[in-house]
């Protein structure tokens, strides 16, 4: 009995250490970046910090619960969960139900929690896609319909996300799906055809709507529109420049003083770069590399143990988190167009934090089942 109890409480140390380190750093940076705007909006400097702390506590509880749920349960209910996510995407578009913030209708109010539907959809899509790839592996590898079926579903999801609009979530879900299909053994030529179609669409966009294309590519020279479409990015770049090697010190950021919009959410990495400098940036990115690398290793072990659903699930979560990290940092550094994506485990955002922690709980369960 004692041996069984010890095993049931064992967790992957690297996943736990990296996740807790990221969450602690995120809590610290949210406190620093949000004090001024919180005081201005609510007359209390710790409003966003307290809310983030509550979400973090809920997230850790959710991760613990998820680590206790057998993977076969996720597999059994993946289709139903995907359907729930799909219905939520439709409901959020209804003016009576969906909550609009900054021109985007992405949230559903559930008591004191504003649920960002796209964050839920990312998770449930990976759950369902992993199940599809495991059940129809032969079809995926040998027949065109094995590629078209999941891409059709993802295309519908992306269309609904673009109606919100939430371009960033659509990009993450689509790229995660494509990468998982590639890992599952889809032949190369469907990807080539898709690439040609995307290139053709961009050319058509440039011809029919040059203004939209200009907005999409304004990140290439934000200084040309520094008081317009490039304002947020130029302020972010100034934060990077001020940070230098060692930063200006925790809490000493100037850009968070109403210069940089969304300083505690989408552009929190810029505040971190300003306050902690290049050293802080490298530390943060190192933690992400360790975490995502460990998740991939766990997926590989599951694949070697012939637990294909667990393997695809782990790969999907690694791709989701990795893509979101790359896009968020790329946006704040000015090498990618603005997408409106949070930095996993770091940025303020309850839905994102809860789903990230839930995903980590699932990974811990996969690691446990693979080892035992």
Swiss-Prot record:
Q: Does the keyword Cell wall biogenesis/degradation apply?
A: yes
Alphabetical keyword list: Cell cycle, Cell division, Cell inner membrane, Cell membrane, Cell shape, Cell wall biogenesis/degradation, Glycosyltransferase, Membrane, Peptidoglycan synthesis, Transferase, Transmembrane, Transmembrane helix
An example Gene Ontology biological process: FtsZ-dependent cytokinesis
- Cellular component per GO, a single term: cell division site
Q: Which pathway does the protein contribute to?
A: Cell wall biogenesis; peptidoglycan biosynthesis
Q: What EC number(s) does its UniProt record assign?
A: 2.4.99.28
Any Pfam family from its record, for instance, is: FTSW_RODA_SPOVE
Q: How does it sit in the membrane?
A: Multi-pass membrane protein
Q: Which residues lie on this side of the membrane: Periplasmic?
A: 34-45, 99-109, 164-165, 209-277, 337-342
Stored PROSITE patterns = FTSW_RODA_SPOVE
Stored InterPro entries: Cell_cycle_FtsW-rel_CS, FtsW, FtsW/RodA
Reactions that this protein is recorded to catalyse: [GlcNAc-(1->4)-Mur2Ac(oyl-L-Ala-gamma-D-Glu-L-Lys-D-Ala-D-Ala)](n)-di-trans,octa-cis-undecaprenyl diphosphate + beta-D-GlcNAc-(1->4)-Mur2Ac(oyl-L-Ala-gamma-D-Glu-L-Lys-D-Ala-D-Ala)-di-trans,octa-cis-undecaprenyl diphosphate = [GlcNAc-(1->4)-Mur2Ac(oyl-L-Ala-gamma-D-Glu-L-Lys-D-Ala-D-Ala)](n+1)-di-trans,octa-cis-undecaprenyl diphosphate + di-trans,octa-cis-undecaprenyl diphosphate + H(+)
This protein's name? Probable peptidoglycan glycosyltransferase FtsW
Q: Whose protein is this, by species?
A: Coxiella burnetii (strain RSA 493 / Nine Mile phase I)
- What gene is it encoded by? ftsW
């Amino acid at each position: 009995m004692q041996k069984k109890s010890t095993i049931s409480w064992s967790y992957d140390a690297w996943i736990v250490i990296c996740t807790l380190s990221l969450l602690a750093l995120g809590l610290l940076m949210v406190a620093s970046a949000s004090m001024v705007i919180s005081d201005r909006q609510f007359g209390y400097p710790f409003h966003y910090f307290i809310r983030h702390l509550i979400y973090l506590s809920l997230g850790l509880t959710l991760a613990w619960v998820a680590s206790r749920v057998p993977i076969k349960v996720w597999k059994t209910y993946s289709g139903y969960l995907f359907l729930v996510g799909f219905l939520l995407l439709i409901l959020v578009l209804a003016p009576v139900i969906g909550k609009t913030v900054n021109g985007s209708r992405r949230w559903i109010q559930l008591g004191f929690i504003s649920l960002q539907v796209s964050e839920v959809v990312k998770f449930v899509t990976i759950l369902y896609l992993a199940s599809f790839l495991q059940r129809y592996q032969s079809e995926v590898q040998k027949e065109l319909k094995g590629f078209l079926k999941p891409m059709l579903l993802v295309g519908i999801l992306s269309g609904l996300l673009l109606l919100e609009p939430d371009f960033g979530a659509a990009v993450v879900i689509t790229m995660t799906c494509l990468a998982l299909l590639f890992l599952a053994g889809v032949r190369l030529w469907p990807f080539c055809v898709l690439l040609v179609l995307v290139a053709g669409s961009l050319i058509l966009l440039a011809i029919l709507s040059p203004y939209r294309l200009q907005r999409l590519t304004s990140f290439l020279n934000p200084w040309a529109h520094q008081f317009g479409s490039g304002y947020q990015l130029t302020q972010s770049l100034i934060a990077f420049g001020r940070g230098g090697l060692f930063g200006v010190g925790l809490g000493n950021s100037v850009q968070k003083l109403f210069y940089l919009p969304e300083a505690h959410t989408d552009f929190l990495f810029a505040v971190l770069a300003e306050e902690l400098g290049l050293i802080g940036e490298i530390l943060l990115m190192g933690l992400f590399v360790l975490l995502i690398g460990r998740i991939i290793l766990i997926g590989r072990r599951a694949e070697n143990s012939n637990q294909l659903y667990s393997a695809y699930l782990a790969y999907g979560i690694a791709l989701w988190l990795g893509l979101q990290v790359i896009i968020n940092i790329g946006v704040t550094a000015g090498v990618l167009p603005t997408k409106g994506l949070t930095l996993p485990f770091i940025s303020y955002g309850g839905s994102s934090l809860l789903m990230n922690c839930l995903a980590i709980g699932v990974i811990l369960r996969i690691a446990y089942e693979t080892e035992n």
